[in-house]
Structure formats: C-alpha cells, structure tokens
C-alpha cells in the first residue's frame, strides 16, 4: 500500500513538472513581454518603418526581429 502511494506521488510530481515546463511555451507568442531589449528594438524599428503592424510582427517573429537588428546596425 505504501509503495503504491509513493509511486503515485512520484508520477504526480513528474506530471506537474512537465505541465509547468510546457505551459510556459504556450504563451501568445509575444516575445517582447519576455525581454525588455527585444521590446525596445521592435519599438525603434516600428517607429522608423512607419508601419503600425511592424512592432507586433517583430515581437512575434524571430525572422522579423533579426531583420530589424540588421537594419539598426546599418
């Protein structure tokens, strides 16, 4: 009886840790909320482009973010 409870507790801990690690990847895709640097870079590129959607595209897409970094370096 005690060994089955111990096994259930271990399984519950494993499931909880897996659920917690996957739930952080399931956010809305806004990576600007995670890092202040990315938010600032995307804001500058959005202001320079004059395109209202550029900021949100930069926050969601790694390709757009790296392209923005390249534009700011030049």
UniProtKB/Swiss-Prot annotation:
The keyword Plastid does not apply. GO terms for cellular component: extracellular region. GO terms for molecular function: potassium channel regulator activity; toxin activity. The keyword Disulfide bond applies. Residues 1-23 form the signal peptide. Keywords: Disulfide bond, Ion channel impairing toxin, Neurotoxin, Potassium channel impairing toxin, Secreted, Signal, Toxin, Voltage-gated potassium channel impairing toxin. It comes from the Eukaryota. Disulfide bonds join 32-59, 42-58, 45-68. It is found in: Secreted. Its main location: secreted. Expressed by the venom gland. This toxin inhibits voltage-gated potassium channel currents in DRG neurons (IC(50)=44.2 nM). In vivo, insects injected with this toxin showed signs of neurotoxicity including twitching, paralysis, and body contraction. Belongs to the scoloptoxin-03 family. This is Kappa-scoloptoxin(03)-Ssm1a.
